[in-house]
Every structure is written in structure tokens, then in C-alpha cells.
């Protein structure tokens, strides 16, 4: 076996890289220096692993070696065929072969090559590191193992390569504090202490804090707050994607995983954490190969491997419950979503970390708003993750504003720029008539430039104060970490000096600057560094498209005027509007059932009396837009099979991927008015679907996804019993009796019983009709004003239109047609004939029992 056949795969790759480097630099020979540079360029190699454990500037060392290579002689005609290994390189490989034999290795590994030739590289390494320290680090990485296979040195420190040491991160204070979840952490420790099957698996929805629980365990181990059995354990998060990545040959993945398992067994103090553990099922499997789950099973069963898994309930059901052999090796720990109060405690615990990261102050009101608003409005995600995201994004937005130029200063600069351009234009014209305007511009420019100087000085002053506060906060954080480190090492004198001398001194300076900053804020500061509930409401608004004011306290005052606001659009239905207003007020006061929709109403009445218009008016009032009205025409659901369109087609049927018309619309706009129009025309089975919505406030679609209706208002309109409502000879009691009879015929009792309110809309009277004419005319008036034409309609004309267009049986709809014929058509003719132009006024008056336009 020659020298090259005795090299490990990694050393062979290093030699190939050195050869490519020599070709690139046009060097005639490959030297040990080329080998060293190739090792420094391999981020996964043993040399880089060793240097990362030492206080070395790797980039500076790399540049130093490169400058040495640049000194070598260059040859113009060089190719792979005529390049040679120089004598020094061959000698260095022979040196490594000698050391290999002494160590009992079967192949020359990369670390052996380095150790055997440390003298060759000493001159270039000396300015950056101690050669003896490097030797010690390389030896520690080997851990006394021998190289018996060509790829054995690729698997040195498999855990370091494929995992992240969470206990080390906890030691360096790089993990966020873990608040609560004590029961789950204690249960996890109990399982880990067991003799066999000592593998807990954390189950919970995405964002409830599964990974945080494991980080909490790592922190407790570092703080020695665990049972004696778990002291000195290391929690290492295994990255499965790194294990699979770059596995070129069949069996390479399995070999890597086996090396990790062997390393864990040998060390006996490692707890493996596999996040998204369901990915081990099928991971790395190929034809004739084993997946990760089957490789792990024997070690898990014997208790040789301490593993903590984390996955969602859905993935656990899909992968683990099908494989009983894998399932029984893990002990499940269920993590439920925390309550709003528990989430608030978590946020308060994270507050300091987030403040330090973003260099801002987070008010407690922002934390409360984050927990409450995320719980109410962001229904498709889970606490505490969604609340933390809100705070984080709000803080990032504030930080961005802090680091940008204030809006007030930008506005002044833009005004100066605009006036300067206008001044130049006037100077070019040289007209005497421009003299007055020029004087005004010069005066404005003088004032604005003075204001700009003041604002810039204020901005710089505020920036300086804020910068100093930020520096002191960072200093405070590092002092706390230092004190913690001294305590852990038992140096209580140094820890005491920091805690009782340096920290109070730092705090005093910070408090003085904070008082100065608060005084600036009271005097109208340009910069704002405090995150408030308004900032959080803005972020929620960006995510959900719900207007900001709807989420804040001011909305409650607005709801008190709901009746008068709705009556501006819906006329002659005072009783119906009062019933709607009461339900909305109950909800806003927090007295209604939070597990049901905000309100569920059945609107009864003849056609054209304002049932659909009431739903539109409600959407406009609550959400400032008719777009938040989800309208579904129930006459499209006459057949039984059409019902599936509401929640989505069943698996295997056309349209399964598209989802349901009702469920998809509510998922996209969870805060809206849902209008089911002409509900009596739908198939009776549709009402069975609605029972769950009315009772529990949610509906499960064809894919098994739960759609939340708790923030919707459900309105059903129907023409049932419209005959009784139109009958003038019946008393109110007789009408109600007739309505109840009609409802019993069309709807099931369990459906009617779940509705909040059954509201009857009366037939319109003549007074209401005249008011409706006024409302409809306002729409035409707005369109005319867009063209610069002002139009008016007198009372007599309104009465004439009401008389011509109103029909008791058809409601207010024919009024639109009457308005088109008697007003709009005549106005259109005048515009097209150029008889009416911009800034003209047209009055529509009655002459000889006919409406005629009068141009002014």
C-alpha cells in the first residue's frame, strides 16, 4: 500500500484542494503551505473545528497564509499533468505516516498530518496562536480514538459537527429566560432519570413553547437546579438536516448517525434533543437502507440513549401512532397553550431581553395588549408565540423609526427643497409681478431654515442621550453576565464587587439619563423609544386588516352611538336596529358568551324593507368598510349535494383543494359580518351545518381544519312570514303568532333556539319612504359633485318620487328605478348635451306634477 492509499478521505480531499490552489496561483509545485491553506478553507475540517475552540482570528490567519502563497514563483504554462508535489510535501506526508504508526492508526488522518508537521507551519502560525495550545485542542478532539477506516476522521466530534450544545449556550447567557412550565420540566426530569425508556417527547401545537422547555432544562442544569443524576449533563440539539446534507454515498447517512449514537453512549453525559422528531421516520432511507427511526430504536429501548423529542400532535398521530415500536420508546408530555395571564408572565420575563436587543423601553400596557389582542384577533396561531411576535415586531418597527430621520425634520427639509425650486423658477422668469411671491418665499425659507437648524440640534441631542442610555444598558447586561460567571466559579469576592459596586453605580447613571430623557419626552421629543399598546394595535391591524381604533378603549364610546349611526342608512326599522344594537353592546361590554359568534340574527320581513342593507350598514359601522361583509346567496344551495360547497368538497371529489366558500372566506377575514341571504331557499340540511357555528363558534372544513367564527356576526335573512308582516288588518300579537307558525314550518326548533335574536322588519310607511328617497338621492349627488355639478331635490319632488316608486309589496327597491327615470336620466341628458358644465347647479323641482331640472 503506497503513501496515497494510506490517506483518509478527508486528507485526500485536502491534497486535491491544495493541487487546485497551486494551479490557480500558477505555481509549479504543491507545497505544505498549499495544504495548510486548503485546510483553512474547509469549514467542516478538523483544523477549523480546533481553531473555533481557541481565541484566534481565523480570517486574519487565512490572509497571512494567502500572502505567503503569493510570494511563490509563478509559471505561465502549468497544467494538472505537469504540476508536481515538492520534496517538502512528500517529506511531510512521510512524517505523518511515522506518527500514524506510533498512534496505532491504520490511515493518515488530517490531525496527524498537522501534529507531525507543526514545525513546518510554526513561523506562519506563531503571530496568531500558540502551537502547543493547538496540539492540545487537536488531541482533545480525537478523544483517544484510533483511525481504522478511511472516513473515520470525518466523524471526529460528530456531536460538535451535527449538534448545538444548549448547555454551552445557557452558560454564555445566549438563551432567553424560560418562565413557567415548571410541571413539564419536572416531569421531563423524572422521565430522564428512569432506567429504561427514559426518553420524553414533548407534544403541543406550534408556538406553545416545546423548544423553550428544553432550553429551560439546559438553564437549570447550568444553574445546578436539577437532581444529582442530571448534574453535568449536556443537552445537545441534533440537526437532522446536517446529518443528511452532503451524504453522497449509500450508507453514509446511517454511518454518521451510528457515530453520533456511539459518541453519546461513550460520553454518558449527553442528552440528545431532536426538534421536529417526526422527521426521523423515513429520514435518510433509500432502497435497501434503514431510516433514522429504525437505527435509533435499539439504543432507545435499552436506555443507552437519552433523547428528548418535540413534535406537534398532528405529526405524532401521523408518524408515531402508526409505529407502535417507536411510540412505546417515548413517554409523552402534553404542553397545552398557556392562558392569557400565563402568556403575560412569559412576556414580562422576556421584556428585559427584548429591551436590550432593540434598545427601547417596553411599557407594561404593551405586554398586556399583546397578550389580549393576539388571543382575540389572531386565532390561527398559539400563545405565547404570537404575543412574543407582536412585541418583537412592534419593537423592531420602533427601533427602525429611532434610527431614521424624524418625520418632522424630513417634512421641513422637503418644504425647503420645494421652495428653493420655486424660487429658482421665479428668478428665471424675471417678471415684476413675481416680486411679492419672491418676498414670501424668502421669508418662508428663512423661517424654515431656522427651524431646520433647531430640529437638527434637538435630534442630535436626543440621539446622544439615547445612545448613552443604550450603552449603559448593554454594559449593565455584560456586568450581570460577568457576576453570574464569577458566582458559578465560586469567586464570590469578584461577584460581590460587581453586584454591590459597579452595578449600582451604573444604575445611578442610567436613572439620571432616564430622567433627562423623560423631560425631553414631555417637552415634545422627536424620538419615541417606548413601545405602547397603540404600537401593538397597529401591528395587529397590519396582520389582520382590522382598523386600529376597533381594538382600543375608544371603540367602546363609539358603540354607544350605534343606533343613530345605523339609522342613517336603514330607515323605518327602529325596533330591528334597537335589537341589533343591544347585542353588539352586550358583546363590547364583555357580557356575551366568548365561545359564540358576536351575534347571530334571523332577519324576517318582506322584500325591499332593509334586511340586507342593515347587514351592510353593520359591516360599515364595525369595520369601516363594506368589504368585510361575506355575502352568500343561499338560493345557490337548493340541492343537498351543493351543501358541501360551504365547507369544501370531500376528499377525492373535484374542488377538494379549493376549500369551502364559507370556511375559506371566514378564515381569510375572521373579523367580519357573514350574511346568508334568502336562507329559506337553501336545502334543510344546511341548517345542520350552522348548528355548530351558532353553539360553539367554530366549523370544521372538509380538510379537518377548524375555522373560528367567534369574531363574526352571523346574519340570516328570510322572506318567511312576509305575508303576515304586510297584512294591515292583523294586530301585533296576531302577526307574531303567524310568524311563529311560519318559522316552525321552515326551520327546526334546535336551529331557532340557538339564534340570539329573531328580528321582524315591518313594511315601510310613507314617511320612511321619503327619507329613503333622500338617502338614494345623496348617492346621485355625490357622483354629480365628482364632476363639479351641484344638484338639489326639494321636498315636493321627494314626495312625488316616493308616490311614483313605492309599492308596499316590493318595498323600497322600485324607488331606485323611479329615481333613475325622474332624476338621473334627465341629468345625464343635460351633461351629454353640454347644457350643464362644471361649477353649475341644477335644482330638480315639480312643475305640472312632473319633475323638471332648473339650471342655475
From Swiss-Prot:
Tell me the PROSITE patterns matching this sequence. CLP_R, CLPAB_1, CLPAB_2
Q: Where is this region: NBD1?
A: 157-337
Q: Where in the cell is it found?
A: Cytoplasm
GO MF, one example: ATP hydrolysis activity
Ranges where the record places region Repeat 1: 7-72
Q: Which UniProt keywords apply?
A: ATP-binding, Chaperone, Coiled coil, Cytoplasm, Nucleotide-binding, Repeat, Stress response
Concerning InterPro entries, the annotation shows:
AAA+_ATPase (IPR003593), ATPase_AAA_core (IPR003959), Clp_ATPase_C (IPR019489), Clp_N_dom_sf (IPR036628), Clp_R_dom (IPR004176), ClpA/B (IPR001270), ClpA/B_CS1 (IPR018368), ClpA/B_CS2 (IPR028299)
* Primary localization class, coarse: cytoplasm
Clp R domain ranges (all copies): 4-144
Q: Which parts of the chain are coiled coil?
A: 388-522
State the residue spans of region: C-terminal. Answer: 764-856
Keyword hit for Calcium: no
Where do the segments described as NBD2 lie? 555-763
Q: CDD domains given for it?
A: AAA, RecA-like_ClpB_Hsp104-like
Q: Which GO terms describe its cellular component?
A: cytoplasm
Q: Where is this region: Repeat 2?
A: 85-144
Q: Locate the region Linker.
A: 338-545
UniProt GO BP: cellular response to heat
Binding-site positions, ATP 2: 605-612
Domain remarks in the Swiss-Prot or TrEMBL record? The Clp repeat (R) domain probably functions as a substrate-discriminating domain, recruiting aggregated proteins to the ClpB hexamer and/or stabilizing bound proteins. The NBD2 domain is responsible for oligomerization, whereas the NBD1 domain stabilizes the hexamer probably in an ATP-dependent manner. The movement of the coiled-coil domain is essential for ClpB ability to rescue proteins from an aggregated state, probably by pulling apart large aggregated proteins, which are bound between the coiled-coils motifs of adjacent ClpB subunits in the functional hexamer.
Alphabetical list of PANTHER family matching this protein: ATP-DEPENDENT CLP PROTEASE, HEAT SHOCK PROTEIN 104
**Family of the protein in this entry:** Belongs to the ClpA/ClpB family.
| Protein purpose | Part of a stress-induced multi-chaperone system, it is involved in the recovery of the cell from heat-induced damage, in cooperation with DnaK, DnaJ and GrpE. Acts before DnaK, in the processing of protein aggregates. Protein binding stimulates the ATPase activity; ATP hydrolysis unfolds the denatured protein aggregates, which probably helps expose new hydrophobic binding sites on the surface of ClpB-bound aggregates, contributing to the solubilization and refolding of denatured protein aggregates by DnaK. Necessary for surviving high-temperature stress.
Q: How does it assemble?
A: Homohexamer. The oligomerization is ATP-dependent.
Task: Kindly provide the name given to this protein in its UniProt entry.
Answer: Chaperone protein ClpB
